[in-house]
Amino acid sequence: TSKGLGAHTDSGALERWLLPAYQHVFANVFNGNLAKYDPWHAAHRTEVEEYTVDNTTKCSVFRTFQGWTALSDMLPGQGLLHVVPIPEAMAYVLLRPLLDDVPEDELCGVAPGRVLPVSEQWHPLLIEALTSIPKLEAGDSVWWHCDVIHSVAPVENQQGWGNVMYIPAAPMCEKNLAYAHKVKAALEKGASPGDFPREDYETNWEGRFTLADLNIHGKRALGIDS
C-alpha cells in the first residue's frame, strides 16, 4: 500500500513569484503576453536559487527534464506516473492566486521552500487533465519538462515490485557545477549531499566508495579535472 504523491511541480513554489530570475522566466505570463510565453526558453532558469537550505528532499539543480527510469515492470494501478502533459499549464498555476475567488491572504496552498501544489480545490481543471503514462517494462525511461505537473498514483493492492529511479537531465552550468562541488565535498566525507536528508550512513563505513573510485565520467559529473 502506498499513498502516492500528490500533483505538483518542483523547482520552487512561492519562489516562482518572488525571485527576480523567475520573474524573467515568466515575464510574458505576468505581463499578460501569454501567446509569447515559451516554456522551452531556458534563459534565466540557471540563475534561479529556489532552495538555499541544504539537506531537504528538494532538488536544487537546474533540470531541463525530470526523468523516471523503471527498475521493475510498472502496470496501471501500481504507482505509475501521471502528468498534465502541457508545460504551458504553469501559466494557469501562476495566475490562479490572482483571480477574484481566491482570498487576498491565500496563494492556493503555496509556501516557501516547498514544491508547488496543484489541488482539486484550486485547480480542478488541471487535476482533471492528469493522465497516466503507459505501462512500463524494467529499463524503460520517461522524461518530462521541468514545469510539467505530475503525480504518482496511490497503490492499494501492490502486485510485485514497483521500483523506479529519478534521474534528471542536468546540463553543465554554473548552478549545477556549484552543486557538483558540494557533492564532491560530501563524498570525501561519506556524508549525505545537500539535496538529501542529513543521514550520513556511510561516514564510518570501511571500504566505502571514494573519489578515487570515480571513472572519467564520474569525475566530469563532479567537476573534477581528470
Model segments located where?
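Non-heme Fe(II) oxygenase catalytic core, chiefly the N-lobe of the double-stranded beta-helix
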Residues: 1-121, 127-134, 138, 153-158, ...
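Conserved double-stranded beta-helix
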Residues: 97-149, 153-226
